[in-house]
Each structure stands twice: as C-alpha cells, then as structure tokens.
Amino acid sequence: MWCFRLSRHFIVYLFSLCAILLLAGCVQSRGGFVSKNHVILAEQNPNTHFEQEVMIVRLSQVLLVGKMSNEERASLHFERGVLYDSLGLWGLARYDFTQALALQPKMASVYNYLGLYLLLEEDYDGALEAFNTVFELDSGYDYTHLNRGLNFYYVGRYHLAQQDFLQFYQADTKDPYRVLWLYLNEQKLKPQEAQTNLVERAKGLSEDFWGTHIVQYYLGHISVEELQQRASEFAENSQQYAEILTETYFYLAKQKLNVGLVDEAAALFKLAMANQVYNFVEYRFAAFELMKLKPVQTEDEKEEKSAVTKAIVF
C-alpha cells in the first residue's frame, strides 16, 4: 500500500510537471507568477496527505466492524466523505455523503456538499434544490449562500446571485474572498458600480487573509510582480503556499477571462489546479471553468453524470 501511494503521487506529479511546462508558453506576462520560461508552483510532497489517508483507513475499519447507532454511523460516513473530498476523490466522497444521508436525512452539511457536486456537473436545478434544502434544515448555514450564489452566477441570474453573495459578505466583511465574488458578480450585474464598490469594501478587509492582497492587485495598487513577492513572504510552509497559489492563479484567470483573453485564462485555471488543493473553491471552479470552455456536452451526457446523485438525494 505504501509503495502504491508513493507511486501514484509521483505519477501525478510528473504528469502535472509536463503539463505545466507546456502551459508556461500560453500565458503572456512581463514577469510575476508566469513567464515564458518560468512558472511558480508550490513544492509537492508525496507525504502531504498521509494523515488524511491514515484517518480514512481507521474510519473504514470502524465502519466495517463497529456497532453503533444510525446517527453515529452517519457521522462517520460524513467525516470520511470530507476526507475523501479533501483528497480530490469526489466520487468516493459522494458515496459516503449519500450513505450518511440515507441514515440521517436531515444533515444540512451533506446537502451542501451534494449540491456543490451537482453544480459542478452543471445540474443547476438539482443543485438549487439541494441548497434550498440546506436552508430549510438550517437557515444559518453560511457557506450555502456562497454556493447557491455561485449556482445563480453560472446560469447568468446575477440579480439572485447578488442577494446570496451580499448576505455571505455581510456575515464577515473582513473576508476578502466574499468581496471578490461580489465584485465578479457586480462586473456582470452593474459594471459601472463594481470598481467603486470594491474600493469601498476593501477598506474593511483583514490583512490576515491572503485574498486581501489579491484585492489590492485587482484595484491596481500593486503589480503582479509585487503580488508574487508578497505570496512568498506570506506563506509559512509549502502547503500554505500551494493554497495561496491556487487562489491567486484562479483570480488572475477570472480577470483574464473577463477581458476576453480566453487562452491565457485557461492556462491560469490549469495552473490553479496544478497545486492540488482539491477542497478549495478556487480549485473546484478552476476545473469547472475549464469544462465550460470545452465544447458543450450533450444533455444526455450531463444527465448521465448526475443521475446517481439525484436518485439518492431526491
């Protein structure tokens, strides 16, 4: 098992490295994170996820032989599902979440995850139903405002997205990521006000979040080269650096996409994924944006991808 785990990560690393070398030539930049001969990525350690993998083994053993109530079993399935999700094993995570839901049908957190998976499969109606169910079970479930807002955003219902993003922002006005999604939505909904609102909201942001520096870049207060320098200073370890780069490449890509530079945006979305921070919103939606840039799937293909989840959840 140890040898298999090491080789799997090594193969993924080699594949990512080859892809990244090709991507470097796709992004035109005067410096900073990406140039023709240089791409910045976090160091990939094969043992990064070792603790999560050990926890999965332990939870699996308990689920296999342990005697427990339905509530306890549902909780363990949910916990293992979260671990699978953090490793990018979304099919296995979905299985555990649906098992948890079968045992405890009123777990709001499970509907939140399943709604997110449905959204990423472009099943917007199914995702909306799941997110609405979250609020029926727990009206204070904060992050579902982000997820439902994203659902509205990606179908072009920017007015409804604004309501969710605004409520999400108001719950924590110091969080720059809430400000960034409001800004991205307002660029579509009311572009003449988006920059002014970003300037005003930026005044209350906390320097504890890396995203505050991304906001400063969006405002034109710092260059991409300065953003790169701050990233290396902000990160305390390679895992945090991977998270910072995932976020940065994603929001740089959104900026490129919004001005019509599709090829550069696609390359940056791929770089956002290259740091393998699977459970970050920016990783998930970098993959989603890339899927949307590909030729449109047929309706039959979309329905086939989400049929299993919908059958169990609804």
What are these regions (language model features)?
Residues 70-74, 108-109, 142-143, 175-177, ...:
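Helix-start (N-cap) detector for alpha-helical repeat units in TPR-like alpha-solenoids
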Residues 46-60, 85-91, 119-124, 154-159, ...:
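Helix-turn-helix repeat elements of alpha-solenoid scaffolds
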Residues 65, 69, 103, 136-137, ...:
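Structural marker of alpha-solenoid helical repeat scaffolds
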